[in-house]
């Protein structure tokens, strides 16, 4: 039996669709249920940001989560396979019609991802203050809270609708299959068998 943490929403749905292709069987959570046991797997629905925590502490054996979450949390996990689903970009954005003033002694950057943000600007030798927000990031530069934002975009439409533009792409992200280090050794055959099946299915696309 392999325990799997899935992030609620689109990535969970796309992941379950992958498992359906692999095993020729429906993988469907009952209404409002957070646990699904099927075909030798126990799936658990959790918040995206919590997937690495479940994996690191071996509450589950493996998880599926975006590379952006792994990088932000510097998660100590085994990265097994890029599943190519849940594709998005982490970008620097600012108000339309304005340029980011890099001459300022320190820029204020609003973000849900302070680690990725600090690392990116540090590598460019730009001094910043990362303002951690939990939602409505797009609002920050429009009301003078920040000079720019670092946020996740899929198409960029939401930014345009909020009078913002993409200035720079920090990284491209998609969902990865990750494993707990102990589980990887304790259940190596099972996990590697799943890895091979997933890889074969993805390669045949």
From Swiss-Prot:
Keywords: Amino-acid biosynthesis, ATP-binding, Cytoplasm, Glycosyltransferase, Histidine biosynthesis, Nucleotide-binding, Transferase. The keyword RNA-binding does not apply. SUPFAM superfamilies: Periplasmic binding protein-like II. The keyword Amino-acid biosynthesis applies. One of its GO terms (biological process) is L-histidine biosynthetic process. Its EC number is 2.4.2.17. This is ATP phosphoribosyltransferase. It comes from Helicobacter hepaticus (strain ATCC 51449 / 3B1).
